[in-house]
Amino acid sequence: MSGGSRIQLLSPRLANQIAAGEVVERPASVAKELLENSLDSGARRIEVEVEQGGVKLLRVRDNGGGIAPDDLPLALARHATSKIRELEDLEGVLSLGFRGEALASISSVARLTLTSRTADAGEAWQVETEGRDMTPRVQPAAHPVGTSVEVRDLFFNTPARRKFLKAEKTEFDHLQEVIRRLALARFDVGFHLRHNGKTIFSLHEATDEMARARRVGTICGPGFLEQALPIDVERNGLRLWGWVGLPTFSRSQADLQYFFVNGRAVRDKLVAHAVRQAYRDVLFNGRHPTFVLFLECDPTGVDVNVHPTKHEVRFREGRMVHDFLYGTLHRALADVRPEDQLAAPAAASEIVRPSGQQVGEFGPQGEMRLASPVLEQPQAEPRQSFTPGSGAGSGYQYQYTPRPSQPLPVAETQAVYREFYAPLDGTAPASLPESQGDIPPLGYALAQLKGIYILAENAVGLVLVDMHAAHERIMYERLKVAMASEGLSGQPLLVPESLALSQREADCAEEHAQWFQRLGFELQRLGPETVAIRQIPALLKQAEANRLVQDVLADLMEYGTSDRIQAHLNELLGTMACHGAVRANRRLAIPEMNALLRDMENTERSGQCNHGRPTWTQMGLDDLDKLFLRGR
């Protein structure tokens, strides 16, 4: 602090401009504050008109309750609000705005005109302010019941801030995204947007389930709904509903992720962590999941006053919320089966499908076996085995038996078909299923393509399966079940590893010692800032134990839980499954292919391999007709 400076009060104008730096970053920030005010007023129709990306003009007009004439000057004052009266009101606030800062901040960096009329008023009133002159001017005006706020020349009096604005298209894209989020949060409100005199969209009130789905399709694109799972789960005072995209409908950017807490759009680290865990082993590397999800909970259990723009929230029971989100999404993705995805006739946009029953089956060692072989198998080559190390806990050994790569003769293939479709007693003639309802979701195998793909026919059309990717997922899920049932064996260290931590980390390690024990670790506190690692999971003996424990402790302190150990274990199991899965260029008999299809139908997450790639795709009859220009 310099010796010549004296402490003095800031002028109201300067104080508001400083506050505007937190609230008003760009035209999209202004739109967010004005639209939230409109929603809080009970509006059922909101019109937004924009010029030059919102820099020259941003006008928001609603049919809400309006503002009384005597309250108009107060509406532009700092910390003037109708939402709360006492501190206790803040603990359970449901309104989107409550601080009373937005209009004052906006009016300090732009030319603002507010016109409003209440239902019991004979006429409307208007108040104007300009950045330099913070004194509001009130006068009569013509306006229906509701409120209009017009913001012109944003940052006209702060050139330094204006320099940081991007191109018109960029600013408008940000503004449009704000409106999209609010339109998803409030299906009961109509939103209408115009830019430079052109109508961008008109979203009418969505009062039923079909209308809500249409709005989601308009905002997120029709492809999202076709590749999304509707969910609605309620437990322990929490309700999660909405749509979660299938792993095959992922994005290169996290630009189709909408999460709302009690109607408020949020971007929260705890939520992001739970979603990331749920998609952990079904998403391709570098891809992002898609979702539109709504969490409803007791407002007193959520603190919304932790960020200037209210984008972040804090949950009183963060661990419970995290586990609820993760469990709900994880189960929803795991429960997907082909029959769920093929309930309706396929359209062109429904070609890519995830999958997830049993004529034959895969044996526990990963080799395919049939309930009753229909043709004599050639002499197998010596078995190759994959063994992930030796020692305690490494008893998982998975083998596969490669088959000769020569294709079956045509006559032998026909014999396979006759015997496969023949009744077990051999008395009735062979026949295909009599109705579409008898055909399994993934149908019956027709042929193998290039030793890589299985071509099958189901009630919809053709199915193509990547046999290695599909078998890899089946093996992986069985390995996880086996590990969960047999438990994790630990391997004691001859020389315990000493780990230097902060006191907070050491406290966390001591508090979660039993949790670590269940995962195969044994930690012992040696001092205020020292912990010894005495045992590690046998399957992770090649891992860097010190680094892993530190990363897990960081997660535990941040989120109250961690999936890092499980992620390491799953990575190892995934490698084992990959080595044990049937390889490309291995020729399969028709019954073997059908065995794989039935296992896919019974396996969780079988729509993606362990690396997130799709395992099968559907091509309906309509798609084939289009290829050959039939019906035109």
Curated annotation (Swiss-Prot):
Keywords for the protein's UniProt record, in alphabetical order: DNA damage, DNA repair
NCBIfam families per record: mutl, PRK00095.1-2
GO MF assignments: ATP binding; ATP hydrolysis activity; ATP-dependent DNA damage sensor activity; mismatched DNA binding
CDD domains assigned: HATPase_MutL-MLH-PMS-like (cd16926), MutL_Trans_MutL (cd03482)
GO cellular component term, pick one: mismatch repair complex
Recorded family membership: Belongs to the DNA mismatch repair MutL/HexB family.
GO biological process: mismatch repair
Protein species of origin: Pseudomonas entomophila (strain L48)
Protein origin, superkingdom: Bacteria
Name of the protein this chain belongs to: DNA mismatch repair protein MutL
UniProt cross-references to InterPro entries, sorted A to Z: DNA_mismatch_repair_CS, DNA_mismatch_repair_MutL, DNA_mismatch_S5_2-like, HATPase_C_sf, MutL/Mlh/PMS, MutL/Mlh/Pms-like, MutL_C, MutL_C_dimsub
UniProt-listed PANTHER family: DNA MISMATCH REPAIR PROTEIN MLH, PMS, MUTL (PTHR10073), DNA MISMATCH REPAIR PROTEIN MLH1 (PTHR10073:SF12)
Chain positions covered by the region annotation Disordered: 376-397
